[in-house]
Amino acid sequence: MNDIWWQTTGEGNCHLVLLHGWGLNAEVWRCISQELSSHFTLHLVDLPGYGRSQGYGALTLDEMARLVASRAPECAIWLGWSLGGLVASQVALSEPSRVDALVTVASSPCFQAGADWPGIKPEVLSGFQRQLSEDFQRTVERFLALQTLGTETARQDARVLKSIVLAQPMPGADVLNGGLEILKTADLREALTAWQGPFLRLYGRLDGLVLRKVAALLDARFPDSESQVFEKAAHAPFISHPREFCDALLALKARLANR
């Protein structure tokens, strides 16, 4: 079996697994890992097929979750950004006893827009899939640019994301298509109502991929969960607002310790 790239760092007494989003790799967390490493034992992961976890083809959401969970500590907080939020959610549903808390960042249990659901239009996701086969590099860059659009530091943040992608091996087109297929088809809205553990959802108000309307809808659907919206952030709040982002995680850790 191919190996998943996994790095453990930090000296905190609380394990925190960090899962990145589509097209990227674990280097996205470098802007906050130093700050968090004195409070958590961090588990930095390249999802199967991404970055240094080469040798995988397109996977289903369940397959990806099972592969990542097989390497994880017995108990941890699971944090997933964007596509990684779906993977973390699937782990929480499949192995709830191993998840101390679920944190989703700029993520949705259903990314695709529907008649009564805000999300990414189906034709946009299909367009990205089609464009991947025509101009691989440009399609990835376009998707990255969408993630920072609207913020005060949009260009700078987009450059950070691009450098992260280029610093490690690129995922293959089949892996990227598989990830887009998960974003098109996954719908965990009903399944996540069964999750009984702590659930923190973090959003950027300027996010053009996961609209802020999603936060309010999920507040109603998951009344025991908590949500926080970073007012001037877009799809990558940990890059544009690292201090506030870390504060939210430290506050969660404190709440868990006082349970």
Swiss-Prot record:
The keyword Transcription regulation does not apply. Pathway: Cofactor biosynthesis; biotin biosynthesis. One of its GO terms (biological process) is biotin biosynthetic process. The active site is at S82 (nucleophile), D207, H235. Substrate binds at W22, S82, L83, F143, L144, A145, L146, Q147, H235. InterPro entries: AB_hydrolase_1, AB_hydrolase_fold, BioH, Carboxylesterase_BioH. Its main location: cytoplasm. It catalyses: 6-carboxyhexanoyl-[ACP] methyl ester + H2O = 6-carboxyhexanoyl-[ACP] + methanol + H(+). It comes from the Bacteria. Keywords: Biotin biosynthesis, Cytoplasm, Hydrolase, Serine esterase. One of its GO terms (molecular function) is pimelyl-[acyl-carrier protein] methyl ester esterase activity. Residues 15-242 form the AB hydrolase-1 domain. It is found in: Cytoplasm. Pfam families: Abhydrolase_1 (PF00561). Its EC number is 3.1.1.85. One of its GO terms (cellular component) is cytoplasm. The physiological role of BioH is to remove the methyl group introduced by BioC when the pimeloyl moiety is complete. It allows to synthesize pimeloyl-ACP via the fatty acid synthetic pathway through the hydrolysis of the ester bonds of pimeloyl-ACP esters. Monomer. Belongs to the AB hydrolase superfamily. Carboxylesterase BioH family. PANTHER family: HYDROLASE ALPHA/BETA FOLD FAMILY, PIMELOYL-[ACYL-CARRIER PROTEIN] METHYL ESTER ESTERASE. This is Pimeloyl-[acyl-carrier protein] methyl ester esterase. It comes from Cronobacter sakazakii (strain ATCC BAA-894).
